[in-house]
């Protein structure tokens, strides 16, 4: 089984999607799902002394303008593990440019954590935490000599639109999955 190609994007897209976690919160290791084999590989260890502030992964059967599956960040109180599948509710969209490529990311919360039951949109997230995420992504590739431009945040509706677009981009690239 290849979770990138064989899992659905979610049980109720775009309201609830599957987040396939590659990197747990607190890690400096950047893991990436190999799109051909479905195995997890160590892409690199971050050059900076930063740690991922969220669980980080992809939405299965999506594709984005940066030439990779669509990224998703899940706010977790405790880190999960690589290859964990989380039912996640999109609440925002983080907009950034990575070395000239549009590299937007969905921000989501786990459906199965009652702590986040009232978090429906980006306005429900403390600004200090959004600033922490933005700071991480602005600086995490700095010692590699790569330029990141942070464009800011949008709400849940923007995230849902981009998810649907990323599903269509997957179909265009890989064909329809029956």
Curated annotation (Swiss-Prot):
InterPro entries: Pyrophosphatase, Pyrophosphatase_sf. CDD domains: pyrophosphatase (cd00412). Mg(2+) 1 binds at residues 66, 71, 103. Substrate binds at residues 30, 44, 56, 140. Its cofactor is Mg(2+). It catalyses: diphosphate + H2O = 2 phosphate + H(+). One of its GO terms (molecular function) is inorganic diphosphate phosphatase activity. One of its GO terms (cellular component) is cytoplasm. Its EC number is 3.6.1.1. It is found in: Cytoplasm. It is an enzyme of class 3 (hydrolase). Its main location: cytoplasm. Keywords: Cytoplasm, Hydrolase, Magnesium, Metal-binding. Pfam families: Pyrophosphatase (PF00719). Belongs to the PPase family. Homohexamer. Catalyzes the hydrolysis of inorganic pyrophosphate (PPi) forming two phosphate ions. This is Inorganic pyrophosphatase. It comes from Pyrococcus horikoshii (strain ATCC 700860 / DSM 12428 / JCM 9974 / NBRC 100139 / OT-3). The lineage of its organism: Archaea, Methanobacteriati, Methanobacteriota, Thermococci, Thermococcales.
